[in-house]
Swiss-Prot record:
The lineage of its organism: Eukaryota, Metazoa, Chordata, Craniata, Vertebrata. The active site is at C132, D179, H212. It comes from Xenopus laevis. Its main location: cytoplasm. The keyword RNA-binding does not apply. The keyword DNA-binding does not apply. It is found in: Cytoplasm, Cytosol. Keywords: Cytoplasm, Hydrolase. GO terms for cellular component: cytosol. This is Carboxymethylenebutenolidase homolog. Belongs to the dienelactone hydrolase family.
Length: 246
């Protein structure tokens, strides 16, 4: 569990024991996990990791879930070979560690991923989802890349960028009620500002009694009381992507 010395409660939750269905590939200077459906498609979703990195089984489970619904999915190593965070690390060093992995400086890698999807996979419609650190990345990308048809940000929010409310395409923000990193006051402010500034569709949804990471870091069979919320959030993600990536 997170404690007062822990600036990010991402260690709350479970690491899935999961055998991924896709494969790891090299795309120019970055590695990526890619999962493809049996039938051909021109739709893809970029899945952005949390602080535990692109190889976390939980994240690959979510990528494969999307693939099962007909999308090519790709989970790139946005840390570009830098070590991911480990629950056993000293949390007092987290802020320093994070400074070398800034969620708003991923354009170089993003451009490589988009080129791969368009040229190698013949994709025409692209969305993005992300968790925690990746949720911040998703928020950032939805401000910068008009070709991203839809975004789903899980428990991630940009706090310090002036134009963070000018979304380019529809974005769903999913938060947990009990999240010490993202207090509900910040969620309310985001919603108020988006109502004023956003010219595209958006939705903000807060799930009661849930903690940071609940959509991809909790196991339904271990936490049966959380199962309806986990399933609902995943359903919301799928419906949002289906609505706007068509």
């Amino acid at each position: 569990m997170a404690n007062e010395a822990c600036p990010c409660p991402c260690d709350i939750g479970d690491k899935f024991e999961y055998g991924a269905k896709g494969q790891e590939i090299q795309i120019e200077h970055i590695k990526a996990y890619v999962s493809k459906p049996h039938s051909s498609t021109d739709k893809a979703v970029i899945v952005v990791q949390d602080i535990f990195g692109w190889q976390l089984p939980n994240t690959r489970f979510m990528a494969d879930l999307l693939t099962a619904h007909g999308y090519i999915t790709i989970c790139p190593d946005f840390f570009v070979g830098q070590e991911s965070w480990k629950p056993s690390n000293d949390w007092s060093t987290f802020t320093e560690w994070l400074q070398t992995r800034q969620a708003t400086k991923v354009e170089k890698e993003m451009n490589v991923v988009l080129k791969y999807l368009k040229e190698q996979c013949h994709v025409k419609k692209i969305g993005v989802i992300g968790f925690c650190w990746g949720g911040v990345v998703t928020h950032h990308l939805m401000l910068k890349y008009p070709e991203l048809k839809a975004g789903v940000s899980f428990y991630g929010i940009i706090r310090d960028v002036e134009d963070r409310y000018n979304l380019l395409n529809p974005t769903l923000f999913i938060f947990a009620e009990i999240d010490h990193v993202i207090p509900l006051e910040q969620v309310s402010l985001l919603e108020q500002k988006l109502k004023v500034h956003s010219k595209v569709d958006f939705q903000i949804k807060v799930f009661p009694k849930q903690t940071h990471g609940f959509v991809h870091r909790k196991k339904e069979d271990i936490n049966p009381e959380d199962k309806p919320f986990i399933e609902e959030a995943r359903k919301d993600m799928l419906e949002w992507l289906q609505k706007y990536i068509n």
